[in-house]
Amino acid sequence: MRRSRGFRSKTRHKLQKVKRPGRSNPITRKIQSFNEGDLVHIIIDPSIHRGQPHPRFHGKTGRVVGMMGKSYVVALKDGNKDKQLVVRPEHLQMQE
């Protein structure tokens, strides 16, 4: 039987959550808001599957260009190509 090549394949360490006391999923990550033009880091929270971008974009930085429902549309470059991702706010962090 062929091996599965699912959405989360080869992410054993990339999507691993660091165990620290008192570090569950805070509600503030879910209700944070961004404005158009803000620079954000894509940091995937592996315990929340909804609105998760592909793991190849984990750690990348992009610019918020709009909203789509509760999610944000983030524009970034993947090599030479411009791409737009639809990502929920749990997987985004504001660049400082």
UniProtKB/Swiss-Prot annotation:
The keyword Ribosomal protein applies. Transmembrane segments: none annotated. GO terms for cellular component: ribonucleoprotein complex; ribosome. One of its GO terms (molecular function) is structural constituent of ribosome. It holds the Pfam family Ribosomal_L21e. Residues 1-22 have a biased composition (Basic residues). It comes from the Archaea. Keywords: Ribonucleoprotein, Ribosomal protein. InterPro entries: Ribosomal_eL21, Ribosomal_eL21_arc, Ribosomal_eL21_CS, Ribosomal_eL21_sf, Translation_prot_SH3-like_sf. Residues 1-29 are annotated as: Disordered. The keyword ATP-binding does not apply. GO terms for biological process: translation. Belongs to the eukaryotic ribosomal protein eL21 family. NCBIfam families: PRK04306.1. HAMAP family: Ribosomal_eL21 (MF_00369). This is Large ribosomal subunit protein eL21. The lineage of its organism: Archaea, Methanobacteriati, Methanobacteriota, Methanomada group, Methanobacteria. The gene is rpl21e.
